[in-house]
């Protein structure tokens, strides 16, 4: 054992050290809770000893010791930042940890100009030289970031995990820049769980690689339609895709090969209660099958066994995973019980009750608490559902007085009123520097909220589990108002992923997490607060292990018990097993088939073979559409093939003929042929098709969101339509009621995002694939799935969206700036950014987005 390791062990087990560590943490807690007390002030000896312990621990390789070292110095910062000994030791500790953002904080906010001994200075300069981020000026990796980056660039497959605040996206972007310089160049896919993340990652990456992409001829795309561009010179691609879009990319034989796939938020593969975890598995498995030697990488937060993701896909090389608990920012976790007037500082097994009578004299409810503890700070407030998020934001906003608005904030309010509606809640909330944020919020509005928050133009953002999807909104404080995600209990992986947003690198040394027990949320079990190792198992493996009998029943076409979502996931997995048996003839065994063979479940494999052996539908269509019932797919194929033989037209109408009547006719046709009455819960009511046809017609014909909303509000008013204001409460719509207006707006946004752009798109894409397989792609007509995805029939507007622009801006460019676009053979070849910007008003939504994306 090295001397430093022995010394570290002695320190961590030393009672005096542990007493000091606790006192330092309570001193910091009093400040964060605004409890004015001198109870935990340190004597001179205690201060010096605490700093000496921190200095010793910073030399360790033990991540617990290094974290403790960081935390001691951070705990003491608010009280002792002007103390000369503190200044020197703080600089020395952060330097030893390679935490350059923390050193920058000391210089910027503490005016810390401490000079280290010459040997320490040399060590710091050497570390800077080695850990400088490529293609940047004065930006350096922390020690743990550099260790990971060094391993990443020297492997062909890797899986890594660390705290949310570690800066995994930062490392991924540095890795991408390195890959772009490879010779020969290769195409990359960044796989993200949601469309919201596509936009965020695209914006961040474009800012990072703007110059490199010109030099190395890389183009960033956000969808699978590469053919929408006219190419005179060869380009390479960085594709930022959801699992669904990757599956679509794989189904297009003309698309170029992929050399790298980087799976961000890989823990989503283990979410047993979300069918998209199975879609993610399918997308990755199909990619590996198609491009056998593809380089494969996984990134996940707070997972103790990151190697599990490589093992899932039979990639199990030694030394191909990395896990660390070392974080460049610290988090203070408090449990505040408003029912019993109690506060606990949570520190693993050493939780401490904090005397807090003075606090509870000022605070009676969650709003009081957020205003008191969050005053003058950036606060994210987590709620468990969209409706609760909007409700809490509105209630909180009513208590805010005399909120001064910045120029940027005033501009954003005007933009949202024009883009959505003047009575939209969010526009009113922003006047009090309050906002809400959820996954299906329109892309442009999400961007506005995130930018306003990042730049501190707004202070309090109420949000849903969108933060759990990886949306990058670091904050000073997080208030957790509910311990559920929807109706389900928050899982440990989700809780710590959410909590990890507290603390903004370079802006502060720590963040605060306040878990609140109140009238609407009781924490019967607080185990989730005590951080422990989080070991995960992918959904497909878990379901096969625990539900093999149910899967067997499904393969026999028998009914099974369980919730709708559970049954859907098991049907999905049964489909995957069945389709995968078709590959056995070519000696390819998928991970799922391998798992069944390993468990001696050959009878399941045989059942699956029997299920599909007489199917006529081409296997590549089944492969691309495993979430649609296999028998339905085959029935549709046989029906269309029979109709084609009779000489009937099996194509959908040409896009130039689309109106309300055509949309309704097509939806009724799809309802019948795909058996939505029995196979798709959301679409089983045939009466709802009239509404969806109306919305679909407006959407694919390019109406703006504000126009769609206005027409819908007119329709509701003129026809006295009943709207749902509560769980079982329906009332006639009233135009003068702001709540009614917002219910209609939220319904429209939800139906565009989920029904049109997800459900309908899935079925229309499947229909197009079948038609193309029967009559050939050149004769297959329009793929309505593209019209639904992009909300336009215009190929140029589609191409503009594919490079990262929103539908709104893409349509605006096409309508107002055609002369700025070089179009060749009906395809987009080149965009003149300067000419386009000249046509839009400075400060408009469109101007800001064009400036950022193009």
Predicted regions and their residues:
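N-terminal helicase ATP-binding lobe
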Residues: 1-854
